[in-house]
Structure formats: structure tokens, C-alpha cells
């Protein structure tokens, strides 16, 4: 015998059979973690454990790839040799280990299945820490006794969901005991996996090559110093700064140090200087799993080594809900890492695989647990290590996840992902069994509140991805030969862009929600599928629809190729979108929508197609060009570039030292040298602006913090930029990733990032995986203890920032890959704003070029006000915001000073350049007049006059106003101020009102209209699209003008702000008429959309399309006629449009059904027509069990509002519950179903559409 010692607690069971552990093991869900400490190890030779090796074939049985047979359960067996191990002093035979694992897998096949079927939805509250200490750490060990395994399937899912107090919910929660973890490990090493055939990798590679265009990893700017090596001289730096040279001869200075990392990746070989200033001394941010004993040889079980690498340093695990103190990057060099129980990713952790050669995480056939990688640990049915909606800051990227060898019946998933904002999965291949009946899944996600996934490829499996989260974004997902590519079982909103589904059974499965004892019935809120292709797949998309919980589903730029059924609804045999060899969709969707009349269901329809500007599309194309995307640069092959570690050149990142100058020096030099700036983890204090020049490429580590603090960021009235990206007018390259921009308060004046640069090539100026956080973290001085949520008074030191990010005019920023902007939800105190410009070089270059420099400076000055003030340029009655917060921001002293200064300076410095066409201060004058009128306050109580006036009693004419309101300070003063300003809205209409106030209120003063200031340089008011300007005369109304000129009275009113009352139009107004219709119709007081459409022989919905102000249920037709008049267009404005035929090769483009039929038919035999249902019906539906109104509408192709109209026994709120089984409901009324038919002896008047107005008097 020989003794072996593994310093990190990692034992190789090829050589070790007897282990006496003298340290305490912590059982957690899915893996056994052994804290590193001393141990005694005793070993014997290989022959004992490897004797009678025929058991190998059973352990590594290969499933029938692509075959039709059910997967064979894994048989774990060993030979007759009764080798034994010592486990915690208890002898355990290898045969016993096989038996333990076999029983456990049988139990897991049941309990994991129940976990999938009993979804745990989000919790939105934090637990009381005092109540969970000691309980949260440990779940009960998996009970894998044979009696339990056999009895559990007899408990139905329904019983488990209803049993809130019993033990059934606890049966879904388990931990892997030390005994079971050890047994799984012994078997994994005693019979190592056979080498991969490479089939899955080939499939993944071939499909990606088939559909994706190649792209460069990075854009390399040219070096400013052009020498043979680019580094032969000192770089130009700021005065008094340390010169940066290529110091390759100095030891331990940040150069590339070749270590035994088995990786060529520069980060793995760089001296690791990353440190958390708030963690204990010696805490490691970067940890290479091989430094902790992992082998990566595909033979040694690396589970314990990996988990030790993750947990090292007393990190935020079982007894910690969250932490910003202990970040970690866990690096995996190339290799194959065999694991037999789950790898637990701690809070604030990155798993980073070698980007040049992705490592493989290989799950053993003896794997026990649910997820090979898991982001949260269940310790109760609703209790986990971390609150799932608060599970921030984690990523996994650059891996191959191989679970093909795991038990096909145990519902194992490669990644169990329960996460929130600031999280990502990137560059991962998932390999699963392709045998029929297997239960393996790539990703299992049941809850969370946000995140991002990109560049993922799924091969095989029961589900490629099983998804549920609040709001999520994915890009470049590929599914190959999965039974179901992905299922989305709940969300609030999900955007899937760039999806490829090839040779699967079903493409996408959308469900209305799963059960569970704590379920809220949450279903899929909405899903948008953009730039996708589904090919060689029998069923493209399957969805279940529920009247109370209907999926809202939109497709844009999607192609179905060789798909039998493109989209089908559950329980219906006919697809709602037929398949074919080639079905191309520009824009299509269905779902619930709401308006003032209620909530309605819109069945499948073509939708207006968004025109994609060239700047937004890339080279990839499935149907039409896809939206442009760019993956984050990996810098895995630097070529001639140099990595500059900022800590090697003076930056401290210690959360105390001012690093502004050191960082600016490095950034300036690196940009000159075209080098990569590496910012190891740390908290880098900046007390002035950090300047990122054009040509910068910056990479952080575990979200290195750039923390603004100090006097320059404290003044709320003088915002100061913390990080400035380029200068105004710059064009070129900037690449930034893995930074966290933050503050240490008080920083009321901080603008965290100002982005000025514009891309030189598509996507060359970008920001990836970088976050903005103000408050709520160690060192911010803005935590709960500093800024209590319900403080009685405002603490000005708790105003965290002026702005998180400002993208200046003329800049372009490619912000992608999970950038998170986190700030307090409450806006308190005064604020400064991004503002806007009234004139700029890009828009007004010709005008500005003829002005003096002083005048140009004055005219291009920023208006530092909220966007609401921009509306003042429209000149109108003062806006009532009915919101004190908005009003106080608009009427702040800072906004007033900004507008007043602009107006006065332009008036002073630019008057000499005024011409008949161009009055330089025109726009500023309008703004200034608008501000003064809007921000006028009542002397009684200080309420804004616009709000006071908004509360006056409604009247039709000013003469009907109460004297107390007409003669009030606010009303009379607003009119007087308007009369005094040549820039205001004051005209003949308001002159009449001012005269009225003087007559009734005993006031005196001028009422004449001042000569208006004109500016025709850029004023659209003199533009008339129809080229028809009409001058009103006495007696005109909207209806009379509309009938005379064959236009819509509503279009006239909406497009003519001069018209205040459609029934009382002041004469002498010059009005630009809208485009005319060929035919108009004046409708009477009893008309409905249906009666009008019937009279003209129109399909249902045509009147609403021609007059889009009418709502979906036509309920506002009569109500809004008071304002809009009574004249409708019954033909298109500006002529009739003829639709183009579909492009060649397109089959079954979806259309929209009007819901009407051509002729009446009798109700089905032996059925009773529902009470009140119309008999003018050509299509019927007999209600049956499990029907919903939404499903009936989809099947019948009828809009929900029309369905309710023809079946009045049903209501919008309770439609489904009011359905009577066996009753017949009309789902296809005939045209004119609502009309009272005349006697047969009286011929019905024919309606003839002419080129004149029609008044049929229905």
C-alpha cells in the first residue's frame, strides 16, 4: 500500500479505494462539497477496482442515436470482486456504490420529473433571515430507498400541487448526501466514459456553418506609432505621467507569464492582480480549476475540485442571499472535465472557458442531481440559496456541455438557470442523446427576472431549452435534432432574435402556464420571434390559447421550410398557419389587445411590415436581411497586439486611491499602440473625468468597477461626466466589455457615461456586458443604512446621479449582450437632464456657416431641460401636467435659466444676421414664452395655473364660463401674457377670449395682436401635403367643409389645430385640407359600423381601416362625433391602393378572415341556439367541455368583439364561464345581420357610391 495526499482535497479513485475523511462535509442540492482541510488517504493498487472489467459496457451504454427505440435505462454494475472503501469510517463495497447510484437514479427519474411538472414561480419578497438561519443551508438528503422510489409515482401531480402543508412538496427538494456523491464519483472513475464520436460536435459545427456568416472577433485600429514592432519607443503620455514602454525584461510586471495552465489564452497566463478591496486579504478573484486539482482528462472525476475552486474564500453561498464583495472568475483550460454531481455557481461568479479551445463539461453515466451546472440551490419548495429575482451578476461562456451519457430517464439538464439581471450564457454547445424517449434537456429555467443568452447550439435531447422568466432576450440560438427545440412555459416578455431550428420534431412550444402549489397561473405574456428559420421540422410552432391568459405572439422575418404545419393551436387539427415547402413571413401575429372599450382577442393576421434601415441589418439573411448583431470580442488571438494591465502601470483599484490620472495615462497610450487595456477586478476611484479615446479596446474582469466620487460630481446644477467615450465628432473604434460603472455618494451631479463616438464600420463602437449601478453596494455610501427607504426628509447625499448614460447627438453606440442599467426607482429632488439643441451643425450647417463664431456658439447651446419643454415649440395653450413631479422638473430654476440664457444671448449676438426668412432667436423666443405661461403659479397656494384651469367646469363655449373661473387670476393672466409676447399662441381666437374677460371682469388693457415674429427657415407650418388650403367662412362646420371637399371630418379636425370647436369655426382661418376620399358618407345618430358596412356591401372592419380613429369595437363612433363630426371616408384617402401579389415560391401566406359568411345556414341538428344569438349566421359552433371563447374565435376566424355582438348572452369579462355546453353559437354572421329587414313588399334601396358625398339616412 502507498499513501497519497491531495493537497486540495481531490482524490484519484483509480488508485485510491479507502478514504478516511476527518473533515465535515456539507450536503447541498445536487453535489457534495468538501471544504478543504486535512485528510488521511490510504490506497491500494489498480487491479482491485478494475478487476472483472465487463461492467464497463453497461455503465457506458450508447443509446440508439436517431433510432425509434426507447432509451435503455443505465445498468450500473461491477464484477464479483467485493472491493470495499472506507467512507467516514464505514466500509462501503463498490458493489454497494453501484446499488446506491442505481436506486438514486430511479428516484431521480421520478422526483426530477415532478420538479419539471411543478414549476416554482418567482417570489417577489425577501425572506426573514432570522427565520431561515440553519434551515436554508441544508435540504433533506435524497431518499433513494427502493420502497420510496416505488411509492412516489402513485402520488399524482394534482395531489402534490394541492398539498400545501403535507410532505409532498418536500419530496421535490433534496440534497446529494456525501455517501451518494462518493458512490457516483467512484463509479465515474472506475469505468471512465468512452471517447466521444464527435457526431454532436460535427452536427453543431455544420449547422452553424450552413446558416451563419463569418465575422471578425475584433476591429484592430492602426497604431499611432509606426515602428517595426510598434513598441520600440516610449508611447506619448501626459506630462509628468509614468511613460509606458514594452517592459519585457522585468519580472512580475504584468507581461504574459507562461504557467502550467494548459492554455494559450493570454488571461490564463497573465499575472493575476485582480483583488476585491472589501474582501479579506488574500482573496482570489481569478481561480484556475487546475490549481485546485482538476485534471480535465475526461477520466478523473473533477466535481470536488471544481466546486472547491468556486467556493474558495468564504464566498456567498448557502448562508448568503447576495454580495458584491466576493466576485470570482473560475477559469477552465481546454480539456474534458468529468463530473458526477452538480457544479454550483455561486453569486457574482463567472465560469470562463478557454475561448480558443472550448473545454467540455462531461457528465458521467453515474451523474446524480438535476442540473450539471446550477445557479441556485433549492432547500425548500419555495426556498433557495438566492431569491431568484435577485440572482444577479453571473455568466457562463465558452463551453461544451455533454450530458449524452447521463441516465436518459432521470430528467438531467446541462444548465439549471434561475437568474436575474446582469447574467448571460454565451458560446455554449449542448450535447444530448438523440434516442427517442430520452428526457435530457439543455437548459431548464423555471423562474427569474431577466438576462441574456447568445450563440448557443443544442443537439439532441427531449427539450433543447425549457424556458420561463420575466423578461429575457436571446440571440443566435441553434437547435438540431431535438424532440422539441424549446418550450416557453411563462414570461412577461421575451424577444428571440436569430433562431435556427433544424430537423427537430417540434420547433417552439408555447404553453399557457404550468401548475404547482404556489402557481399564480402565469402564462406566456408575449413572445416576439425575429429573424428565424424553422426547417425540416414537422411542426413549426405549437401554442395553447386560453381566454383568460392568451399568448401574445408576433413573428417578424421568419421562414418555414419543409414544415408540415407552420403554427398550430392546441386541440385544433387544422393549423392556424399552414406549412409547406416554403412559407415566408414578413410580419404576423395574434393575441390580446386592449382599448377604451375593453380587452379583445385579435386572431392571426398579417401585420404592417417595419422597414429596416440599412444601418440596422447585417449580412446574415434567412428571409430578408437579419438585424445586425455582433458578439463580444474574445481577443483569443491577439496577433501583434499587446495587453496592458492597468495595475501593472500604477492603477490601484483599491477603492481608496484616486486612479483618474493613472487610468487616463494607460488609456491614452494603449489607444496609440492599438493595445488591449485589461482592467483586473478592483474598485477604481475616479475624481474627475476618465477619458476613453477613439481606438480603445477595454476588457474588465468580473465587472471591474469604475467608481466616480468627489466634489466634481456633487453639484446637481453642474452635471459632470465620469467616463467620456471619445470626443464630439470622433469616428472610429471603441470596444468595451465587463465593466461596472458606479458611484460613491454624494454624486447628484454625476453623468456616469457620455458616449460621443460614432462607428467607422458597422458595430465598431460597442459596449458589451457592462452594467450601471448606483447605490446598493459596498463602498457606494448609498446603501439602505445610509438612505432609508421611508425617510421623513430628503437626504441630499442620497441623490445618486444626474444620468446613467448620455449618447450625444451624432454618436452611435452598439449596446448589446446584457448591459444592465440599475438605479433607484424613486426620483427625488431637482434633476438635470440630457437636454436638446435647437440648432446643430449636423442639421443646420448651411445656416450656421454664415454666422459669426459667437453667434454660432450661442445658437448651438444646449437647452438643459426635460423633453416635455420641447412641446412649447408647438405654440398652444399652456400644458397641464397634473403631475407635480413633472411640473417641478419643467419649471425648475435650472431649466428657466437655460432657456432664458439661450434667448438673451442669441438676441444679443445674432440680431445682425436676422433676415426676412431667418429670425435667429425665433425658436428660443417661443420656448421662453411657453415656459413663462406654463410655469405661471396661482398666488393662492402656489398651484400651477395650467392645473388650475384644467380643473374648471367643462363648457362648450367661453361665454358659458363661470365668472369665478373666467375672471380668475390664472385665466386672465395667461391671456394677458400671451397678448404681450410676439412669440406666443395669441391670435384672433384668443383675442376674442381676452375681450370677453375685459367685458365681464371689468379689466382694461391692450388686446391687439402683435406683429408676429416669422421664421421660415425651418418651419413646417407653411407646408400643406395636399396642396389645398381653404379659408373658412361664416357658418362653416367640420361636417360642411368635409362634405364640400369630400374629406373626413375627423381628419380635418385632427390636422387643423386652428379649429377648436367643429360646430363653431371662426371665419378667416387658413386651413390645410387633408387628402380627399373618392367617397364620403354622413352618418346619422343611430348608425353603427355594421350598418354602414352593410349598406355599402363592405367586409367587416373596412370602415375602421378607412377611418382609423374608430376603435376595435366601434363603440366610439357616436360618442366622438361631438368633436370629430359625422363625415366618414368610405374609400381610401388619396386614391385606392392595389396590393402586390405574393412573391414567387411563397405558399400559404396568412391572411385575415373578416368573420362574415355569405349566406345563412341552419343551426346544427339537435342543438339549442344560445339565448339572443342571431339567426343570420352561416357558421355555427356547438360548445363542448374545455372550450374557451378565445379558442372558438380562433377556430371560427371571428374577432372577439363581433363574436360577442352576435352572441349577446356572452360578456367580455366572463365569456368562457358563460358558455352553455351543447348550445349553438354563431361564429360567422352574414353581412347585415344587425339590420331590421324591411317587408318583402318594400324593395330595399340600393346604395350607389358616387364621387360626391352620400347621406343615406339609415
Swiss-Prot record:
GO terms for molecular function: chitin binding; lyase activity. It comes from the Eukaryota. The keyword Secreted does not apply. Pfam families: LysM, Pect-lyase_RHGA_epim. Gene3D superfamilies: LysM domain (3.10.350.10), Single-stranded right-handed beta-helix, Pectin lyase-like (2.160.20.10). Residues 148-168 are annotated as: Disordered. Residues 1028-1073, 1179-1227 form the LysM domain. The keyword Glycoprotein does not apply. Residues 157-168 have a biased composition (Basic and acidic residues). InterPro entries: LysM1-like, LysM_dom, LysM_dom_sf, Pectin_lyas_fold, Pectin_lyase_fold/virulence, RHGA/B-epi-like_pectate_lyase. Keywords: Chitin-binding, Lyase, Repeat, Virulence. Disruption phenotype: Leads to enhanced fungal virulence, with faster decaying on infected fruits. PANTHER family: AM15 (PTHR34997), LYSM DOMAIN-CONTAINING PROTEIN (PTHR34997:SF16). Non-secreted LysM effector that might be involved in manipulation of host defenses for successful infection. In plants, chitin acts as a microbe-associated molecular pattern (MAMP) that is recognized by lysin motif (LysM)-containing plant cell surface-localized pattern recognition receptors (PRRs) that activate a plethora of downstream immune responses. The LysM (lysin motif) domains are small globular domains involved in binding chitin in eukaryotes. LysM1 contains one LysM domain. Belongs to the secreted LysM effector family. This is Non-secreted LysM effector LysM19. It comes from Penicillium expansum. The lineage of its organism: Eukaryota, Fungi, Dikarya, Ascomycota, Pezizomycotina.
